[in-house]
């Protein structure tokens, strides 16, 4: 598959299908997501992603600015992968996140909540949150910045909803955040 031009930092205007697997790989987000497997279960690595996997590096495929302009949600996915895997974000990738993090405000709040919930739930949560702070991404999360700073220094496990509650109690929360009735009653 190959994608046409992205207009909204999320979805391509057109999608065309190709039999060339390299076209498919080159449109993916991070090198660690570029592996293929053939019918004999042999792993195919066309982008030397094994090196990033072994070195625990999150790196965009090709130009990070282009990848994040195509889909701003990819920036939040980078933090989720840090939280889950304990990997480091490659310097150019992190620099692009820092420069483009304001576009996170254009992502549907429900998608943002899903990615943040997964980030809050990860074993390496604090490492991911520190990357959010370093890249100033936390400043673009509708009032969660102070809570994220606080949580990044906690040495206790929190459920995602508890992390949101901490952020809401500490921060100046925007009314964009949407929770279920059950979650609102807890909050």
Model-derived segments and their meaning:
Residues 1-187:
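Catalytic cores of the polymerase beta-like nucleotidyltransferase superfamily
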């Amino acid at each position: 598959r190959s994608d046409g031009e992205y207009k909204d930092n999320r979805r391509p205007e057109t999608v065309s299908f190709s039999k060339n697997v390299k076209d498919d790989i080159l449109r993916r987000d991070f090198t660690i997501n570029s592996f293929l497997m053939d019918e004999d279960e042999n792993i195919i690595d066309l982008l030397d992603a094994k090196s990033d996997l072994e070195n625990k590096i999150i790196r965009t495929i090709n130009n990070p600015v282009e990848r994040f302009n195509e889909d701003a949600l990819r920036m939040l996915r980078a933090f989720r992968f840090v939280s889950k895997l304990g990997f480091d974000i490659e310097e150019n990738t992190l620099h692009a996140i820092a420069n483009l993090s304001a576009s996170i405000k254009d992502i549907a709040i429900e998608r943002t909540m899903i990615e943040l919930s997964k980030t809050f739930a990860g074993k390496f949560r604090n490492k991911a949150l520190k990357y959010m702070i370093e890249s100033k991404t936390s400043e673009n999360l509708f009032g969660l910045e102070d809570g994220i700073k606080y949580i990044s220094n906690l040495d206790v496990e929190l459920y995602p909803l508890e992390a949101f509650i901490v952020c809401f109690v500490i921060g100046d929360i925007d009314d964009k955040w949407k929770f279920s009735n059950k979650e609102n009653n807890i909050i």
